[in-house]
Amino acid sequence: MALLLPLLPLLVWAAGPPGPLGPPEHSEPPLPAEPPDALFAAGAEAYARGDWPAVVLQMERALRARAAIRARSVRCRLRCANATAVVPTDGLEPTLHDLLFFRGLLRRAACLRGCGPTQPSRYRLGEELEREFRKRSPYNYLQVAYFKINKVAKAVAAAHTFFVANPEHVEMKQNLEYYQMMAGVRESDFADLEARPHMTEFRLGVRFYSEEQPAAAVLHLEKALQEYFVADTECRALCEGPYDYEGYNYLEYNADLFQAMTDHYMQVLSCKQGCVTELASQPGREKPLEDFLPSHFNYLQFAYYNNGNYEKAIECAKTYLLFFPNDEVMNQNLAYYTAVLGEDLARPIEPRKEIQAYRQRSLMEKELLFFSYDVFGIPFVDPDTWTPEEVIPKRLREKQKVERETAARISEEIGNLMKEIETLVEEKAKESAEMSKFIREGGPLVYEGASVTMNSKSLNGSQRVVVDGVLSAEECRELQRLTNAAASAGDGYRGKTSPHTPSETFYGVTVLKALKLGQEGKVPLQSAHLYYNVTEKVRHMMESYFRLEVPLHFSYSHLVCRTAIDEKQEGRSDNSHEVHVDNCILNAEALVCVKEPPAYTFRDYSAILYLNGDFEGGAFYFTELDAKTQTAEVQPQCGRAVGFSSGSENPHGVKAVTKGQRCAIALWFTLDPRHSERERVQADDLVKMLFRTEEVDLLQETSAEQEPTAATSTAGLHAAGKDEL
């Protein structure tokens, strides 16, 4: 925190000379009479009853209302930022710095409040509806309605607009093919009504560049840059919203003033850095354009050269080199332009000032974000490839280097192993294609005493395994005692009714919470350390058994006990946890699983490690996608682990615990380090501090002859909600 505090005085705002605080005099234009969610719902209802003019009216109003609210929010935030200009604090007493800082915050807040709606929640879109607008769903309704009222040109534009963002939509593709064959439909009718100006201009510039029309290329690329910074300003302004709690974290969030400010400000900065990706993304395309902003100057320097403008060519080359100073080709180009123009004329030409300012601001933001990643465990994934290495703290650089080297080594060795397996598969020509799924499985468990009891074949599925002997009887008892002790100490969700059934209670503890309670002497510290080590043990077993090419990262983990409520068991027909899929929303009637939020789409593998079997019910079972046809059942017992991939191939549930208490460690993993658990980073650091060792004790059990497994991830992001297996 100490490195952040000196920066605070630089952020002081004031709205003119000292004076009384008050709301701004300026007021924004009125908000739409109806919020976009109500208009969208009205349009959908009109569609259902076939009232096509009403569909057009309501959906068009919904689109305009959402755009107006967003534009109003951007205008308001930018106006308030401009009205509270930065003032230097040099020469002031140090004791006044904090007061001036918060005085500026109050002025900004008063300004924002003055232009906000009287009922802000009425105009705030929920996640689901925001997703519908991002998917351009209103245009799906509109294209049908326009066609029904014989406005074919508008129908074509709406269909094209929807298809640009949904290129896999088969029906819309067929509609567009039909429109192309219709008489009177022009090519210009196929317009993207949601096209972003900066991307449109960039594409035009690149097209003219490819067609060797440098003058036209320059015109559109320069326009693209202007529009880019307009879009960047708007995107960054929209980041300054309320704090986004992750899952159920708000129930346990407990931070002091500076921790809360840090958490929120880092979230805002991370969002603003994410505008780089947002502005480089194209609807319907999975990956954004790499190095999007610098690439403008790569095109421009050569276009200006072909146009005979060496001054501008030098300016753009030097600007590009701000991002990639060691680019060999660009340095050669710059040397050539300088030689042609002359050293005396070329030397005074500087990179563009607005790009210098952009780069400086971006690097300062990255320094703060990497610092918070290193010190507080708040993850940050840099969207740029041009960031200088020295911006990243040395300790974090070393961590990332070790992770990359370990991942590369494991990938290479697994690749060699897979080549051997592929050779075996080719030799067995008579085996079915399904066999390849099982061949990937079956790697060593890497720990003595552990053995595979059931594999995918015996569990009637794919990417499934049951392992016994993961824990000893004494370790199971010790971890059960830890759960009860942590519940007595209080961890935020002890003794609550289960979120999945009113007939059971549950309580539990996360790894970090257990370690903190151990540090405070409220639970045995060695038991908390055992809990940490056991989760690492399961992770390494999963990586090795499923022969994963990249490391697994913890997405969420907790030790939880479910207890049957005796008086609520009579006539009980529900499950302890109904059938579900861990990374998608299961629609059992349609036999589909939709991989989109609010599902935890980033989860790739799941595991549950049982601590006991002395209870009634509580069996774990797999089903088909219909959630009814059971394919396999696993009875819990001490030291038994069930591991499986988290996708639609593995719907699963937990049968009712009808008597006694069932305790287990539930673990979810991700292959994407951006979604790894923030608490895990803090737990890793706490273990190193408490036990003064660089390696977890259990890792020493792995013999030198066995296959290497993935290194422990030190990346971290958010803790998911308290969901259970």
Curated annotation (Swiss-Prot):
Alphabetized Pfam families for the sequence: 2OG-FeII_Oxy_3, TPR_leprecan
Recorded superkingdom: Eukaryota
TPR repeats (start-end): 36-69, 136-169, 198-231, 294-327
Record's catalysed reaction(s): L-prolyl-[collagen] + 2-oxoglutarate + O2 = trans-3-hydroxy-L-prolyl-[collagen] + succinate + CO2
Function per UniProt: Has prolyl 3-hydroxylase activity catalyzing the post-translational formation of 3-hydroxyproline in -Xaa-Pro-Gly-sequences in collagens, especially types IV and V. May be involved in the secretoty pathway of cells. Has growth suppressive activity in fibroblasts.
Keywords: Coiled coil, Dioxygenase, Endoplasmic reticulum, Glycoprotein, Iron, Metal-binding, Oxidoreductase, Repeat, Signal, TPR repeat, Vitamin C
E.C. code: 1.14.11.7
Subunit organization: Binds unfolded collagen in a complex with CYPB and CRTAP.
InterPro entries: Leprecan_dom, Oxoglu/Fe-dep_dioxygenase_dom, P3H, Pro_4_hyd_alph, Pro_4_hyd_alph_FE2OG_OXY, TPR-like_helical_dom_sf
Active site location: 662
Gene transcribed to yield this protein: P3H1
Tissue: Expressed in embryonic dermis, tendon, cartilage, liver and kidney. Expression in the kidney is restricted to the calyx. In the liver, expression is restricted to the interlobular septum.
Coiled coil: 394-441
Sequence motif Prevents secretion from ER, location on chain: 722-725
Name the UniProt record assigns to this protein: Prolyl 3-hydroxylase 1
Species for this entry: Gallus gallus
Molecular function terms from GO: iron ion binding; L-ascorbic acid binding; procollagen-proline 3-dioxygenase activity
Localization in the cell: Endoplasmic reticulum
Cross-referenced SUPFAM superfamilies: TPR-like (SSF48452)
BP GO terms, sorted: bone development; chaperone-mediated protein folding; collagen fibril organization; collagen metabolic process; negative regulation of cell growth; negative regulation of collagen fibril organization; negative regulation of post-translational protein modification; protein stabilization
Annotated signal peptide: 1-14
Ranges of compositional bias, category Polar residues: 701-715
Sites where a glycan is attached: 82, 460, 533
